[in-house]
Each structure stands twice: as structure tokens, then as C-alpha cells.
Amino acid sequence: MSDNKVEVDKRRTFAIISHPDAGKTTITEKVLLFGNALQKAGTVKGKKSGQHAKSDWMEMEKDRGISITTSVMQFPYGGALVNLLDTPGHEDFSEDTYRTLTAVDSCLMVIDSAKGVEDRTIKLMEVTRLRDTPIVTFMNKLDRDIRDPIELMDEVEDVLNIACAPITWPIGSGKEFKGVYHILRDEVVLYQSGMGHTIQERRVIEGIDNPELDKAIGSYAADLRDEMELVRGASNEFDHQAFLKGELTPVFFGTALGNFGVDHILDGIVEWAPKPLPRESDARMIMPDEEKFTGFVFKIQANMDPKHRDRVAFMRVCSGRYEQGMKMHHVRIGKDVNVSDALTFMAGDRERAEVAYPGDIIGLHNHGTIRIGDTFTQGEKFRFTGVPNFAPEMFRRIRLRDPLKQKQLLKGLVQLSEEGAVQVFRPLDSNDLIVGAVGVLQFEVVVGRLKSEYNVEAIYEGISVSTARWVYCKDERKLEEFRRKCSQNLALDGGDNLTYIAPTMVNLNLSMERYPDIEFAKTREH
């Protein structure tokens, strides 16, 4: 068996998706603790303690206690090498999150057991559906009062349209939380509070009918036996093939803050989640065990190091292997580049990567030549597909306090748009600059970064824009005519793509009726 195959088989690359405040950052911490990447979980954001979560590292994130940028962490667990892509959890950070989901092979969905399925979870699940990504589910916060577990699973099935197969089952909740029963292993793992910061041995009782169980948890043991009869009759059994197709999700219960149940999830991911999968390109399917190196960029991050105004392009390796100093072909610009200083990540701690395999994420230093969606190969000319831009949902006009810095403003905005922090539009008929985002917080981030990184003071003004669509037409003549007649609604985005800026949805619908040959697209392939 080749080295490459051994390494590929070891890899598991996944992201965590959840609604804000469902406990995603805490889970990330605890997962790293189990992977020995952290000695003591930095319980997230004790405001006074100065102990910040390892994966939240940009200044603004430290101030607010939210993860604004996707960071990447690699750690060994159970004979596998796990790559965890942390996704922005806050209300407003979704476009980056959407794109991160294109770089993983499976996802862990975290649900607050007191609340059930929430909006953001629904949106993110829609994105995972584009590629039928396998989903593992963790019902979190069992140390609080929760909704009925069967009701929670029914809601996941109804709202997210995915079958649930419970792997562990909770015994009590809130102050009466006693532990979980592991259905496949037929064992009860007992919960003790106050063990959230370190990994300690848990008491395990083998067998649901073991008299030891009655001694340990009293009448809860009989309740559990009755409940399991019901659960076995009413729920799905775990089916590995259905899981790999994205049709069924294994469900685990626990509390991330109490560091309980996290090892069960990791065991499940290592045992069941797919190793690095083949990827589609515009030429053919690229298999992970091919000899030649290929990869694509799914995110660009500015200033991971405040001392240097650098940018790092995050690349998912798809086939072959990266070796320090190798030559890569940058397909979009048709140039070969020597890469000797790619990085691996442990959230903000960068190390030079000597070698990387399919499923791994590496960082390339970028001085403005790399864009989101770029493909790198060892000479072959094709493009990986499926890394989209999403039409913004909110818009502002942006202008300078000091009009002499227009050039820096445009440069800053174009760079931030290439990175995916925001989208920028330049109307054909005016000198305005319009910024589009998927959520309000992105606007704040952009003004903050323009000031700290480009020394530009910018302010926003309201603008009557409802939505944007990328426009295409196979017939050049018809496109030119459309451009002439609708120029007051047209703009170029950061990559000079023609975009229709609609003041209202009614206006958009009328234009779509009036120009049936023009395609108005909600997403755009990079």
C-alpha cells in the first residue's frame, strides 16, 4: 500500500455547523482537548479571565467572543488524523461559513437541546445538501433543562429532512442529568459535574440490565429500560450507507461545557465519516489517490499576523501530496509557482508545512494573486467546481471621510472582497461604491479592517438596494443591449463580473420577465 493511500485513509476532514450560541466554540475546544491539542480547555470567553478560546483569534473576535473567521485545526485521534474547520458562529457570518462547507467531507451539527432546530442550522443544512454531505448530530447542553429527546429527533427529521438514528441516549437532564446509555456498546457512562476542563476517567457500567446500574442511579435505571423499549421501536437503526449518502444522521447526546459525550462524537467521526472524497472539476472527477498534486482555495484570510500585512489563502488538498518547495501550476493565471512556505494551522499558531495529503488544509502566502475558488495542479488545466459566491442580502453605500484616499479605499475593498469578507459593487453610471454582505456584522468588520489595515476612515450610508444577481447571456448582442438599457441598475463586482442591482424584488421580477434571455443568478462559481 502506498504511503499516500495510508495517509489518505487516516484523514477525516469536517466542520461544525450550528445556530449561534448552541455551543459550537465550546465543542471545538473540547474536541481539541481530546485530540491533545490543548492541555486545558480555555473555557470560552471568561470576560475577566483573559483566557480566550484557542480558535477565536482575530482582535474583533476576542472583543466579542464570537468566531468571525474560519480557522483550521489538525490533531490526531484514535489512529486517525482529524482536520477540524471551525466556522464563524455568529448571527452574521455566513458566506464564509457556506464556502467552508465546500472544503469538508462531513459535518457535525450541534443543536441546543433546550431550543431544537434553529434558523441558521436550517440554512447551513441547505448548503450541505448541495453535496449530500454526511452529518453527525450532537444534542448539546444536557446539563440544562431540555426538550423531550424523542421530540428533538422528530423535529430534526421533519424540518431538516434527514432520518435520525440515536447512538447514545440521555438519562435525565438539567440538575438530574445522570449520564448516557451507549446503545451500540450496551453500556452506561455516568456523568459527574465539574469535570469540564480536563479529561478524566468516567465510570462505565456494562449492560443495561446490570444491577450495578440500579445502585448507581436508583429509579432512573428502570426508567431507562422502559424508555429504551420505546426508543428502539420508534427510531431508526444506524445504517452506514444511508449516513454516507447524507440521508441519515447518527445522534449523540451530552454537554460540551461538562466535557461529556464529546469523545463519543469523535469515535463516531473516526469510525464512520468518509475519508477524503473525489472532487468534481470541469474536466473530470479527481480521485484522492492520484499521484499528482491538486487543490483549491476556499477562503482567503487577511492579516493572520498583525505585524505583517499579509494574506493567507486556505487550500484544500484534493489529490497527490504537497511537499515543501514543490512547483504548482496556478490554473487561472496560467503560471507556475514555487511554494516553499505553505503553512499548517493550529488556530492562529502557524507552522511551516513540510508535507500535506488529501483532506489537509494548507495556507499559501498571497500577495494579491490568489482568489477564492482558484485551482492549483502540477500542470493539468482544469478547474474544481462547487465553490460559490452567494448573492448578498444587505447593502450599504460606503464613502470616505477624507476624499483623497479613494484609491486606498477601492484597493482595500477589492482585497476584502477577494477574501470573501464582503462583496463590493461599482455601479456603471456613478462613482458610488456599494458594499454587500450576508449580515450586519460584516459591515462593521469591513470598516474596522479598512481603518486598521489600510488607514482609511470610511462611513456607511443607507441605499435603496434590495438584492443583487449576477447576469449572464450566451448572446453577446442581447447582453450588450441589456447593458445599454439597464445601465442605471448594473454594476461590476470585485472581480469585474456584471451584476444587476435591484432596488426592489418587484423591479427584479419585472426585469426577469422583460429580458427572458438574460440569466439572473443567485450564486456565482468562483
Swiss-Prot record:
List the coiled-coil residues.
none
Q: Does the keyword S-adenosyl-L-methionine apply?
A: no
Keyword Cytoplasm found: yes
- Chief subcellular location: cytoplasm
| One of the Pfam families matching this protein, by short name | GTP_EFTU
Q: Name one GO cellular component term.
A: cytosol
Intrachain disulfide bonds: none
Family from the record: Belongs to the TRAFAC class translation factor GTPase superfamily. Classic translation factor GTPase family. PrfC subfamily.
| Record's protein name | Peptide chain release factor 3
Q: Organism source for this protein?
A: Shewanella sp. (strain ANA-3)
User: What gene makes this protein?
Assistant: prfC
